[in-house]
A protein has these predicted regions:
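Conserved catalytic-core motifs of GNAT/GCN5-like acyltransferases
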Residues: 76-82, 128-130, 140, 145-160
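A short beta-loop-alpha structural element at the N-terminal edge
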Residues: 6-20
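Conserved acetyl-CoA pyrophosphate-binding loop and the N-cap/start of the following alpha-helix
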Residues: 102-114
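A conserved beta-turn-beta hairpin within the catalytic core of GNAT-like acetyltransferases
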Residues: 78-93, 103, 149-150
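Conserved beta-strand in the GNAT
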Residues: 61, 67-76, 92, 97
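Conserved GNAT acetyl-CoA-binding A-motif
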Residues: 112, 119-131
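A short helix-loop-beta-strand connector motif used in the catalytic cores of GNAT acetyltransferases and
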Residues: 47-61
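Conserved GNAT-fold acetyl-CoA-binding loop/helix
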Residues: 26-48
Length: 164
């Protein structure tokens, strides 16, 4: 890994590049998106970023020659306190992604280490993520553990979304 590489916090000026990175991540993770999904994401995601970056969404990036080549998102959520998150502040890691030509340089590890240092500064009680098989050992190596809970991970989705 290049020792001159720095992890930076992305800002409003990075939104176009972040939308591109998010789409690349989603396509790699989910397979091709349909045209209407791409259009919706390109239309709505910039507004989401404008509203949330540096408020409750912290995006860590690595650049090579001014181009973002790796990123990870830390979404901070405040919940009613419980023994599992005693101060109510939790984080969720999303969108850990390195462009294919820049993989195996240690960028994801560097970003995750920086992200977790920020989580400590933000006094998050716990940080969670969903891992692919490819990322599992990286996350274990920076301190994540399997969540052996008595609870089942479940979700609900409406049949259709109400359009704005």
């Amino acid at each position: 890994m290049n020792n001159l590489v720095n992890v930076e916090m992305a800002g409003i000026n990075d939104i176009d590049a972040l939308v591109k990175m998010r789409l690349e991540y989603l396509i790699e993770d989910n397979g091709n998106l349909n045209d209407s999904e791409v259009i919706e994401i390109k239309r709505e995601l910039p507004n989401y970023f404008k509203k949330h970056i540096s408020n409750d969404l912290f995006i860590f990036v690595v650049r090579e020659e001014q181009t973002i080549v790796a990123c990870a998102f830390l979404l901070v959520i405040e919940k009613p306190m419980s023994p599992a998150f005693i101060n109510g502040k939790t984080g969720t890691v999303l969108n850990v992604y390195t462009c294919p030509d820049y993989r195996h340089k240690g960028y994801a590890r560097l970003i995750m280490e920086t992200l977790l240092e920020e989580a400590k500064k933000l006094q998050l009680s716990v940080v969670d993520l969903k891992s692919t098989d490819d990322g599992y050992y990286l996350y274990k190596s920076v301190g994540f553990a399997d969540d052996n809970s008595k609870y089942h991970l479940m979700k609900w989705k409406p049949d259709t979304l109400v359009q704005k």
